[in-house]
């Protein structure tokens, strides 16, 4: 983005903000008022940043002009030069802040999320690690004040999870958790290991935006719904009614099966929630792929087959391979203190997008 178009963009945004302010003051009502109010609120953050940036630019210009005054004494000149240095130091940060606010918004960022964790390579140890990851995200959600609801769970005999999913409700949940998608690897000595050897296992995390019926319309004709008796470990039937539900979205082939609840109705409702999220995410993935192909390069690092993070318990470290960040605080991270990683990943994503402008 060249200087001229950047400046023009800022002027247009400020003009639109003023127009909306006048519109809201004119006594409009109904849907027009609701729409204008939302637009006005959406612009408040960027307008505040633009005003701070413009103020610093104006002060710098004023200080440079004042510096040219021939009648200035030495002390005043030194004071002005210090002010100029401070303003010149602050301008790049303020400009970057404005540019970040101008970046296209991911429409899913404000949504709640569904998180799915599956044990990968490593047998029982992988299932135990999947359970530990699940507890880590549950604790993170608690620290953020988000609502955490288990949707489905497939347990092993000793406390591990073959597969588990949950709904995490709150403001901007997806924007915080979307970079957690991928393969998480653990290196540790299993409790069952008598020789003290370090084992490596893995679990896959998928984070999907939670969508409502208004976002993804599911037509009845596009769904195949099968019901069957729920089964427990070893395949034995655990009840006598067809409470388990399998829903297939025929156009995409995406299937969700749930049997956690005793009620068929509850299993169906949860399955539809997960199905909507998976269809929505598949549509987002296709759009991202199209944009990437248009630029002839892959966008970001959200490939779920990619190893993104390693948790090394003997060394007490957690390493995120996408941003080369290693923290020697594994206990804190496993207990839900993820902000240091999440904030660094968001900053890295913003930097990539800024480089494309």
From Swiss-Prot:
Record PTM N5-methylglutamine, positions in chain: 236
Superkingdom: Bacteria
Main location: cytoplasm
Record-linked InterPro entries: PCRF, Pep_chain_release_fac_I, Pep_chain_release_fac_I_sf, Prokaryotic/Mito_RF, RF-1
Region Disordered: start-end pairs: 283-313
Pfam families in UniProt: PCRF, RF-1
Name assigned to this protein: Peptide chain release factor 1
Keyword Cytoplasm appears in the UniProt entry: yes
Entry GO CC: cytoplasm
Post-translational modification remark: Methylated by PrmC. Methylation increases the termination efficiency of RF1.
GO MF assignments: translation release factor activity, codon specific
General function of this protein: Peptide chain release factor 1 directs the termination of translation in response to the peptide chain termination codons UAG and UAA.
The keyword Metal-binding is assigned to this record: no
